[in-house]
Regions:
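Metal-dependent peptidase/peptidase-like ectodomains
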Residues: 234-267
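Short acidic/polar active-site loop segments enriched in Thr and Asp
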Residues: 174-175, 287, 306
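Non-catalytic positions within long, well-ordered alpha-helices that form the structural scaffold/packing
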Residues: 169-170, 282, 301
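His/Asp/Glu-rich mid-to-C-terminal helical/loop segments that flank catalytic regions of hydrolases
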Residues: 317-359
Length: 359
């Protein structure tokens, strides 16, 4: 297996996270990266996108991708990649797709990075980032899209959960966009709650309800996370600084498309949390809760991949109505156009030389 295309620091990080198994895991990771290169004909992909619950059906609609000029290069079953489990949860696909993606115009002005996106205009924030509706593109970028993911509650080990992330890193990805379906931890209230509007507990949120109403399908940029799963992608003394996993510059680009930002917490699942657990999580300053994403983010960060995330509001944890998986899937499907736009913005940032992978 040729490792010449992998930066030296990343290859060493791969060896480090595989040190407990005598090198077998590393061989599988490198072989998986070779398979991706052979099937796709791409020496190095730039961006990894992982689709969360409910987006599988959209990912099967090729027109949903090609309408914006995306070109599908290849489809690869996850089962063809060594050590990568096939997702069993409803709403998750079992493929990885290779696309050539049009890169949205990204430029640096006096106030920071700006991205032109699709059908959305947002005010410029403190980080100087906005998404605009001009729809201008510059260049094309190779992107890997995983149509689903596996979870701890499927009976898998943490290393199995992150195997695809590690293979993608070995295949060259420098940016990763991780998406998921999350339960909103703001406390609903007011007459709009029954119609699917989440009005936050203003004492906790520090803002007025009128300004901060959440709707099903709203996207939140993940600023930070709390790992309550009791799991780690590492075995042995792999001491990784995770103070700032969620890349500020990538997240700033996303905030022009999805202006909400907050903290995501990962639980093991598969059961949803109790009322007492929900109150405790909210008291910790958590905004959204789910059962994925965090282990992948940690594994990618250790390999020098710049990570950002979007959590789709799929339910309201304080609602008296019971949460069902079917309702979660329905709520997130409408977020696909914004996720697609986010990928194009990240591709644009990558073309402008903002990648900072291990070297």
């Amino acid at each position: 297996m040729d490792t010449s295309a992998i930066p030296a620091a990343r290859l060493e990080a791969l060896r480090q996270c595989s040190q407990s198994d005598g090198g077998a895991k590393l061989r599988d990771i490198l072989r998986g990266a070779d398979i991706i290169r052979q099937v796709t004909g791409v020496d190095s992909h730039a961006v990894l996108v992982t689709l969360g619950s409910g987006l599988r059906e959209v990912s099967l609609d090729q027109d949903a991708w090609t309408a914006r000029g995306w070109r599908l290069r290849a489809r690869l079953p996850l089962s063809d990649l060594p050590g990568v489990p096939v997702p069993t949860a409803e709403g998750h696909g079992g493929e990885i797709l290779s696309f050539t993606v049009p890169a949205a115009v990204v430029f640096r002005g006096e106030d920071g990075v700006s991205a032109r996106g699709e059908d959305r205009v947002s005010a410029r924030g403190e980080d100087g980032v906005s998404a605009r509706g001009e729809g201008a593109f510059v260049g094309e970028v190779p992107v890997l899209v995983a149509t689903g993911r596996s979870h701890l509650y499927e009976g898998l080990a943490p290393t199995q959960i992150v195997q695809l992330s590690r293979i993608a890193a070995a295949a060259g990805v420098e940016f990763a966009l991780l998406t998921n379906a999350g339960g909103c931890l703001y406390r609903p209230g007011g007459e709009n709650t029954s119609s699917g509007v989440c009005i936050p507990d203003t004492a906790r949120a520090g803002a007025t309800a009128k300004e901060d109403r959440w709707q099903l399908g709203d996207l939140m940029v993940i600023d930070d996370h709390v790992n309550l799963s009791g799991a780690s992608p590492f075995t042995g003394p792999v001491f990784v600084d995770i103070w700032q996993i969620w890349d500020r510059e990538l997240s700033a680009v996303l905030s022009g498309i999805a202006p909400r930002r907050g903290v995501y917490a990962m639980l093991r699942g598969p059961e949803f949390q109790t009322a007492a657990e929900t109150r405790a999580l909210a008291g910790l300053g958590i905004d959204m809760v789910g059962m994925s994403t965090v282990l992948e983010a940690i594994a990618l960060h250790q390999l020098g991949v710049r990570v950002c995330g979007l959590s789709v509001t799929s339910d309201f944890s304080f609602s008296s109505a019971p949460t069902t998986h079917q309702a979660v899937l329905k709520a997130v499907r409408g977020a696909f156009p914004q996720i697609r736009c986010a990928v194009e913005a990240l591709a644009g940032l990558w073309t402008q030389g903002y990648s900072k992978h291990c070297a």
